A protein has these predicted regions:
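Glycine/small-residue-rich loop that forms an oxyanion/phosphate-binding "nest" at active or ligand-binding sites
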Residues: 64-94
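A short acidic, often aromatic-flanked loop/helix-cap motif at beta-alpha or helix-coil junctions
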Residues: 56, 74-80, 170-172
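Boundary-proximal intrinsically disordered activation/regulatory segments immediately upstream
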Residues: 1-58, 144-145
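Structural motif
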Residues: 30, 49, 90-92, 111-113, ...
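Short acidic-hydrophobic, aromatic-tinged amphipathic segments that line or gate anion-handling sites
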Residues: 1-4, 70-73, 164-171
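Acidic/glycine-rich phosphate/pyrophosphate-binding loops and surrounding catalytic core
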Residues: 84, 88-108, 144
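RNA substrate-binding interface of SAM-dependent RNA methyltransferases
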Residues: 103-172
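Short, aromatic/basic amphipathic alpha-helical patches
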Residues: 56-66
Length: 172
């Protein structure tokens, strides 16, 4: 059990939550909450962290125990979390790597292009809306918000797992 905020894993998760550079360098990002954990592709998950309180949920723990995981003392988990009221579960995931072919390769692709979009909540909502509209993938300019920002991840409500995305230098 992890019992200290000085634990290296805890420090790293805090960095992944706060720093785009850390997410890019490590190729990892954090997704919090039951829904985001439940929808995450298993092959993206590097490790799961569960608060001590949540270990009493047998259904959740049955899912968690199939993956690498650690139990975290509740007070430490609150420090790791990017949200005001943590749900008690977070996953560190490997950032997927997509190509232009992944986005344009299907029959009659519908591509969404985002240029200079800065607000994380708006970015996630737009991705979610795009998925609902049948978008096959997203191209983002390098000046857009980091799609693995925790606020973007939360606001996609899982769409980020199902829709390929690629950063490009320019859209022209």
């Amino acid at each position: 059990m992890i019992t200290s905020v000085n634990n290296g894993q805890v420090k790293n998760i805090i960095q992944l939550n706060q720093k785009t550079k850390a997410r890019r360098e490590q190729g990892l990002f954090v997704a919090e909450g039951r829904k985001m954990f439940g929808e995450a592709p298993a092959d993206w998950i590097e490790k799961v962290y569960v608060s001590e309180t949540l270990t009493s949920d047998p259904v959740l723990m049955e899912q968690v125990e199939k993956l690498p995981y650690d139990i975290v003392e509740d007070s430490v988990f609150r420090q790791m979390s990017d949200t005001q009221t943590p749900q008690g579960i977070l996953a560190v995931l490997r950032r997927p790597s997509y190509t232009l072919e992944d986005i344009l390769g299907g029959k009659n692709p519908l591509v969404m292009v985002l240029e200079d979009l800065q607000d994380p909540g708006n970015a996630g909502t737009i991705l979610r809306t795009g998925e609902g509209a049948g978008v096959s993938g997203v191209l983002l300019t390098r000046t857009c918000v980091d799609i693995t920002n925790p606020k973007v991840i939360r606001s996609t409500m899982g769409s980020v797992y199902r829709m390929p995305f690629l950063y490009v230098e320019s859209v022209v």
